[in-house]
Amino acid sequence: GPTGICTLLCVMLKNPKHIIMCEKDEERIQFINKHYPDVLTVSPEECEEFVKKTSDHGGADVVLEVAGAESTFRLAWECARPNAIVTIVALYDKAQSLPLPDMYGKNLIFKIGGVDGCDCDETLKLIADGKINTEPLITHTYPLSKIEEAYDLFENKRDGVIKVAVECWH
């Protein structure tokens, strides 16, 4: 979704050798392929095997988990190579458990936390300087008078919506 794509934009600033994005929604896959053609997309079912085959060390050096489901949490650490970093961007509805016997020998580093407000100035500067282009994320625009319609579109994920901009000056 939008958080995953924004995370992708930040990852792209680091120019990694490969970026692999695991996505199950076909509209989002098309969006990613259209706007970010260097990003490799893969389905959740094929992700672990694809990551291991594509990477140099039998797994990803860094994994960012953005979806927030129990299955995606597990997939994140399973795709990580030994001694990798797994960053949790997602917010979960319930506590996740670390199946330590399954993880034994991976020596993973987990980084967990929400949005850090102290980085907002840097993020806005990156956008203003054109280093992060968020314009493709705004797929729909509505006047303030139609805010309920805009929210309904976004909430129900219709018409390929990623983000909705609301114009307040109409």
Language-model features: locations:
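Hydrophobic/small residue at the entry helix of a nucleotide-binding pocket
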Residues: P2-T3, V11
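Generic hydrophobic/aromatic pocket-lining and core-packing "Φ" positions
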Residues: L8, I29, F73-W77, L100
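Adenosine-nucleotide cofactor-binding segment
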Residues: M12-F73
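Conserved acidic E/D residue at the C-terminus of a beta-strand in Rossmann-like folds
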Residues: E23, A90, G114
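Short conserved AdoMet
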Residues: S55, G68, R81-P82, D159
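C-terminal hydrophobic helical "lid"/dimerization subdomain
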Residues: R74-E78, G117-H170
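Rossmann-fold dehydrogenase core element
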Residues: I85-T87, L98-L137
